[in-house]
Amino acid sequence: TTWSRGLGDVYKRQNKGGCNLSFAGLKTAILRISSTLKSKQEKYDLAASFQKTIEEILEVKTQVAFDEFEKTIGKKERAFVIAGGVAANIGIRKKLIKVCKKNNFRPIFPEPKLCGDNAAMIALVGLEKYKVKKFDKLDLAASPRLPLDQKAKFLKGAGVRL
């Protein structure tokens, strides 16, 4: 199809090395492409391509992480925890189990019913902040990169603080 190249470009950008990743470019590509599609079948195909692209990116990034683990930690007992909303996705689970088996890691998943919503994790952060009387003003801007530790040093491009 004419739009699959756009997803391939996002895939190539994500797999330039390292463990950092962002799906912002993929989300933008999907939104741009979906606005041009007319038939339901094209939309179904795009959704399937979106799923497959995410699975492949996570497979590659997990392999990179396992390789880094091997270099820095060695051959200790290996367990890989997959949690959050991503762990509820059957296709992603299968890909990550495959990578775990290939690298002798034991995959650990919560039950699917515990994976579907990040609200519990957000509530836990709220509870922890409440316990130490750390309150934000009501005009706090929403940010997908808002760190839990506001004092941490920002790492440009990584979307994380250490």
Feature roles, as predicted:
Residues 1-11:
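Single conserved hydrophobic/aromatic residue that forms the stacking wall/gate
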Residues 9-80, 87-105, 130-133, 150-162:
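A contiguous, well-structured pocket-lining segment that forms one wall/lid of small-molecule binding clefts
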Residues 110-150:
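Glycine-rich phosphate-binding/hydrolytic loop that grips phosphoryl groups
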